[in-house]
Swiss-Prot record:
Pfam families linked to this entry: kleA_kleC (PF17383)
Record's protein name: Protein KleC
Key words, A-Z: Plasmid
Protein family per UniProt: To E.coli KleA (KcrA1).
Domain of life: Bacteria
Annotated source species: Escherichia coli
């Protein structure tokens, strides 16, 4: 269950709908931002897995020293 964004707005006496609408628009932005953060985290996990697999493939062809030297030259 998610908490309502800025629920105190609803408790204001005689609150006008413009204020409620602004709150709702901000809440929607927050919801979208939260979803984007979840997507970012999933993508970061994929990147880590795939880069590890790629490095493992490189290790099948080149020695540790060759890979280490290449990383050094690339500034990593």
């Amino acid at each position: 269950m998610t908490d309502k964004f800025m629920p105190w707005i609803d408790e204001l006496p005689n609150v006008d709908q413009e204020l409620v609408a602004q709150r709702n628009a901000i809440a929607e932005k927050q919801r979208r931002a939260d979803e984007l953060m979840r997507q970012v985290e999933r993508l970061r996990i994929e990147v880590m897995r795939e880069s590890s697999r790629l490095e493992e493939r490189a290790k099948q062809r080149w020695t540790f020293n060759e890979i280490d030297l290449a990383k050094f030259r690339a500034g990593h």
